[in-house]
Amino acid sequence: MVLSTKRVAWVLVLAAAAPSALAAPKKVSGGDQRQEVSITVYNQNFGLVREVREIEVGTGTVDLEFRDVAAQIQPQTVSIKSLSGANALSVLEQNYRYDLLTPQKLLEKHVGKKVRVWRWNEKLGKDEPFDAEVLSVAGGQTVMKIGGEVTYNFPGRIAFQSVPENLMSKPTLVWKLESKLAKQKVEATYLTQSLNWRSDYVFVINDADSAGDLTGWVTLINNSGASYKNARLKLVAGDVQRVSDGDDHRRPMGGAARMSANRERQFSEESFFEYHLYTLSQPTDVLENEQKQVTLLEAKGAKVQKKLIYFGQQYWYRSKYGEVQKNQKVGVYLDLQNTKDNGLGMPLPKGTVRVYKADKSGAKQFIGEDNIDHTPRDEKVRIKMGEAFDVVGDRKQMEWRTLGACTSESTWEIELRNHKDQASRVEIYEPIGGDWTMVESTHKHDKKDAHTFTFDVNVPANGKTKIKYKVRVKWC
């Protein structure tokens, strides 16, 4: 038998199984029967789906196929109840079928069975049919018996008479129900993975670095394997405890996501348990493989304070340290007060703040970004912008001596140099361990906590400032 070298063309000829072949008639409910849908999305990559459908269930013991659920559903979290009566519906059995129809699965289900194959006949100038038996599909290669020969990688197309009953085109919940009403309004709820949201903030500051306009966006990512049209949307901000069961059938969802944006719809916020709940004011479409952005907040002229901070290290006080730490970087930060007086005063979900500033031509330039944690109202937000280019520092240990088995005394000198044409204010943060005492210093220090003291110094334009201090540390 001579086989053509033409590329394999997969053609699946699918014929629906006759109802008479089924063990019992099944009731089917699809997404087109949804009357209500709401989703609550958590910023830990999962969500709660609640939907209401009106279904012709029938009475007695019935099988219901509940289709168009999320592909990333956690079936052990599913709950169903009737809204038509307290005892109108009871669940006898629940199954989740996710053995999905693919060319490979179709072949696997036909191992040991007959199929029809077609190959190109050069002499006839058309495809020629043959009966074949599928022997194996192991390793992704199809082995078949055609006539008296066994072959693999057949260069043609394969046709199947029908789809095996246990292969589903979409993930489907199947319930065996005891129904007392023929037509019922049914509510189903479940958790699904791959629904996520995050906050993205855009902060445009003024020329003086003293204020700016802050816009907060909710970015919703739906890779759950389902679309939710005209859905009521709620978001939960907070760290919700979850348990991993270690038994996850779900597949990773790939593909590029579409992006849509809406600046008009706004969220209302409320405290909920020990978290915060944000509710979108009107329904929205959350489509499969989509990123949607909705405005969370807008604050005009929010005051901000730029800070230059120079950090030390705890371990420097434990031993003699001979090396000079030269040209150490000075961090640049923006401090923003989350208060009503500052145009904010609402719980800020964790997310990324991206900061922009206009140059002399008026064009906005990106100047830094940082992640912020969940921030309650009336708390400070600190944004790390980067490191100063023109302000640097040196640190060196001038003296070090032991005063006992676990007590030492050391003298340090910090030199800050400012290469800008205007003065700069720099905060020096000195973390220190053990039981410590400031013996002497050239500048006033501030004890922030048990293990931190600071200096707040002015560094003149194109000049330098030296700070010298002696500290005694007991660590046992």
Where are the model-predicted features located?
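Long, intrinsically disordered, low-complexity accessory segments associated with secretion
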Residues: 2-7, 16-476
